[in-house]
Amino acid sequence: MNRYLLHIIALTVAGCCLPLTASAKKRDKSDALTDSVMRRIFCYAQQVDTTGRGNRTSYAYTKFQMRTNKRNATLMLVPTMYAISHGAGRKFITEFYNRITVDEKGTPHISRQLNLSTIPHRRNTMTSVLNYMTPNVYGETLFQENILSPFHRTNRRYYRYSVTPLPYGMAQVYAYPRIKNTQLVETRAIVHVRNGQIYLCDFEGEYDMTRFYISLTMGKEGFKTLGPVKCDLRANFQFMGNKITGKYTTIYDLPKVLSDSLNNVEDTTLMAKVRPIKLNTDEEMIYRDYYDKMERRKKQEEVAEKEKKTDIVKDVLWDVVGDNLLNRISSGFGKESQGYFRIDPIFNPLYMGYSQKKGVVYKFNLRGEYAFNKNLQISLGIKGGYSFKQHRFYINVPARFNYNAKHEGFLQFQVGNGNRINTNRVARQALGYIESKDSIGDFSPSVIPAIKDGKTDYTEFKDQYYRLINHWRFNPKWAFELGMVSHNRIAVRPEFYHKIGYPDKYKSVAPVFGLEWRPKGEKGIVLKFDYEQGIKNLLGGNIDYGRAEFDAQTILYASRRRSYSMRFGTGFYTMRTAHWDFVDYTNFHNNNIPGGWNDEWTGDFELLSSQWYNASDYYLRANCTYEAPIILSAWLPLVGRYFEKERFYISGLVVKHLTPYTEWGYGLNTRLVSLGFFAAFRELKFDGVGCRFGFELFRNW
């Protein structure tokens, strides 16, 4: 009986193992094919001869049809959408024909020769989607610095791959994200098994409020196999009840047909001449309805002109004022588009931010440039902001004249109102660190308790500054700056300083010198030395001082869009006189107009009291940041898919009477906002927490 049971068990186990063994062999064979094909895809771009890819010119045709399925008043808040947010129908079509010149570094320069559009005023709409039309399939990121490509070796940890063999030596490759995240895409491609060349490719994903479906036909020979010859895209945009659908088609590598002198011309005859594919019935109908409408409107305007009637609400308030208040204003000018100007929306709640010290801050930015030739350019910018918590308006106006491109020679004049500042003596007393030299009459912080909490401007000075700098680079490693800087400081409450026998106005005028060293050239660490020497009686100055600062900063870029930002610096005053009352460092100051996630690394301390910036005659600080698209929060279920970047912050500071001060932070970047959470430690003791956020919505639109 026992022997019978043993036979039954043995046969059962053997029967179970046979299909498992066959399945295992089949799976092993499938895995081997997948690994083999993916290795060839990962290596394909490095094996292609790219000779001739630079210094060449080609032409491309793009058409897109847009439909507003649902819309409401909030659509006018979306950049580039104001023109289609009211009236003007529901369907639109745009075509343009571009000249693309690739320089020696492989950077494309695009000039638009023809442009037809039924969008009012030929406005550019959903321009951010056009970035999806030229994906870098074999690169680390698909679209400029966004979306991790499944066909780059460093990103394979984020994808699962499956390969199905097809006839004629081809295979179908599927790539599935291991987690749901806006930095990853679902992918299907037809590839050649022998060398890993991609012939056809489809991507599906979501980024920056847009759901997209992309279908590519890749080039067939040489370096052209690294890019598409045709791209079809469907984009779905949804925002606060608005639903917009777009269909895009771009065809690349077209022959030259028109004169290169054409610049953004609206001509239906020329467009029909270069159009490589026919319009479908729906597209022809959109054009027909549009031109019929324009003809009727022209006749109505002729009648209105005779009757001298003007629709103030429609023509002025809605089209002009509303457009300029809620939409970006940008335009080029000059016969060959030598100049441009751009103004951020004047009134748009999406352009606000928040920080612990300044509360809600509204920001705006204006910039323009004109190029006389490759060497000579002039530019002007206006960057401003208003702090609702401080009830203060900040502005910075830089004007720059570039006169030598090879040596980065430029002359820059900058004017603005800086942070309000206390004298260093008042600042130290407000912080509770009174030194023998700080005697200033009968003043004591106990008279004004609110000073300790930073809630009064009773002792502060307003600051109006001017800065003129000439910059010159000797070679890729060495550069210098030479110029002049002036500060006019006027007491907010002059009567306070009159009472204690101190001046209520100070003016400093100082020559400045800077020396910059880049040991590894353009890419790598930047070391800079700055020296500023205030001279009494120079152009009306009444302060003598000397200040030196050393600064070192670098950003190390790693694979998978990771980066390490580091900045170290020190500064000190070398000369002091009887009226040496202001401590104002160049590289250690309170940033009065904070930017968004992509601002340059400035070494801000989020929770540090503003009094500390001008209480010590020396400082030593270090700031480090680690950034990556997927660290911790991206792996969370449900919400993790919306986190596009994450950061860790570590900042340290040593000043007189505060040794050390540290801040630790964690930041998140989503399509809507950037968030930062910080904890401060004062002399190794917990000193509080805080947060900061800024709107990121449509920042790249």
Model-derived segments and spans:
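Bacterial N-terminal signal peptides that target proteins for export
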Residues: M1-I9
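Glycine/threonine-rich ATP-lid/beta-loop region of ATP-binding domains
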Residues: L5, T21-A24, Q553-I555
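Bacterial N-terminal signal peptides
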Residues: I9-C17
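Structured extracytoplasmic
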Residues: A24-M170, I179-L184, Y248-I346, L350-G353, ...
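One face of beta-strands
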Residues: S58-T62, Y159, V185-A189, Y199-F203, ...
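Short, conserved secondary-structure transition motifs
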Residues: T62-N69, A235-G241, D253-L262, G416-R425, ...
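Exposed, low-structure sequence patches enriched in small/polar residues
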Residues: L142-I147, T269-W701
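Gly/Pro-enriched, hydrophobic low-complexity segments
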Residues: S162-D267
